[in-house]
Amino acid sequence: MSIMDDLMEGRIKLYEIERHVPVDEAVRIRREFIERTCGVKLEHVSNYSIDMERASRRNIENPIGVVQIPLGVAGPLRVRGEHADGEYYVPLATSEGALVASVNRGCSVITRAGGATVRVTGDSMTRAPVIRTGSVVEALQLREWIYENMDALREEAESTTRHGKLVKIDPIIVAGSYVYPRFVYTTGDSMGMNMVTIATERALELLTRETGAHVIALSGNLCTDKKPAAVNLIEGRGKSITAEITVPGEMVESVLKTTPEAVVEVNTAKNLIGSAAAGSMGFNAHYANIIGAIFLATGQDEAHIVEGSLGVTIAEERKGDLYFAVNLPDVPLATVGGGTGLETASECLDIMGVRGGGRVHAFAEIVGGAVLAGELSLMGALAAGHLARAHSELGRG
């Protein structure tokens, strides 16, 4: 009997194939099983160049192949950061026609205007468990215990990692008899979710041993991971980034085909008032477009795109020129670990010169500049009334 026969008869499970054959053969068998079972032909999914054996150990379970997304590049983008200072080409993986062209136009404006000033204003990764006590009185006592034993909790947490540092535990929210302490770490060049989860678990072992409180879940959603949340908008998570540019008025008119005053009005009416009316926490036009395209290109955790959608765009007319800024409080990023080791992701990080250790802040500054470029271009198109035409010509439906 063949492995395929065993699969079809239910004698082995899809996840068990690698116990019998090498990874590449297991991928082929699993894919053929899906083709037979679902009545499809997966000729494109089966074509790839990445090391699937390595990926199956680190990035994927039950692999059957690879999905391909068109990859474009925007630039050069002049970035004036503390860690990234130069002209960069930004890889963007997307299936949305007109997106790369729009970001590219923004890069052109920014570079011609002297470059984007970009700063990383915050750097943290968080994990917030939920802990049960017997009453609100006990909950408040536990909160006080955490404050008083911060050094001991830090020692326990940091004993699990060479790179993670517990900066603070704040806020500590009490809701009835439940306590939600938000553990805040720095994590070096990795995104750090696994790191802070393991570190927090170790700290909680001390807490439960000393207080008798019961940890309901290692994540109580005050983190807040992979969801839009006001706590992240206010406190920050991942890399907090601000990028700004002052575009001369004549350049706004000649390149963006509009005026500084028109861009300011669109930003106020759309990004500020419109977002408030909708109850949105994204006071911007489309941060997620650029964040998503960069994340997919560079092997970031795609579920964090929703966090990168948070933030506020600022536009002001200053003596006939346009001051334009983007503020992204919550962009989890990595240049090591996770999906960054996949061959295509590594190449895309190499395009920007940010692969490997010691480069995550440079990466963050380039990301901020790219979001600024995309936001500036779209706001210019909206102010000029060109959005529908651009999508008609480049999006093609």
Swiss-Prot record:
Gene3D superfamilies in the record: 3-hydroxy-3-methylglutaryl-coenzyme A Reductase, Chain A, domain 2 (3.90.770.10), Hydroxymethylglutaryl-CoA reductase, class I/II, NAD/NADP-binding domain (3.30.70.420)
Pfam families: HMG-CoA_red
Active site feature: E96 (charge relay system), D301 (charge relay system), H391 (proton donor)
Keywords of this entry: Isoprene biosynthesis, NADP, Oxidoreductase
Superkingdom, taxonomy of origin: Archaea
Gene Ontology molecular function: hydroxymethylglutaryl-CoA reductase (NADPH) activity
Biological processes per GO annotation: coenzyme A metabolic process; isoprenoid biosynthetic process; sterol biosynthetic process
Assigned EC number: 1.1.1.34
Record flagged with keyword Oxidoreductase: yes
Signal peptide: none
InterPro entries per record: HMG_CoA_Rdtase, HMG_CoA_Rdtase_cat_sf, HMG_CoA_Rdtase_CS, HMG_CoA_Rdtase_eu_arc, HMG_CoA_Rdtase_NAD(P)-bd_sf, HMG_CoA_Rdtase_sub-bd_dom_sf
Catalysed transformations (reactions): (R)-mevalonate + 2 NADP(+) + CoA = (3S)-3-hydroxy-3-methylglutaryl-CoA + 2 NADPH + 2 H(+)
Pathway membership: Metabolic intermediate biosynthesis; (R)-mevalonate biosynthesis; (R)-mevalonate from acetyl-CoA: step 3/3
Protein family per UniProt: Belongs to the HMG-CoA reductase family.
UniProt-listed PANTHER family: 3-HYDROXY-3-METHYLGLUTARYL-COENZYME A REDUCTASE (PTHR10572:SF24)
Function: Converts HMG-CoA to mevalonate.
Name used for this protein in its record: 3-hydroxy-3-methylglutaryl-coenzyme A reductase
Organism: Methanothermobacter thermautotrophicus (strain ATCC 29096 / DSM 1053 / JCM 10044 / NBRC 100330 / Delta H)
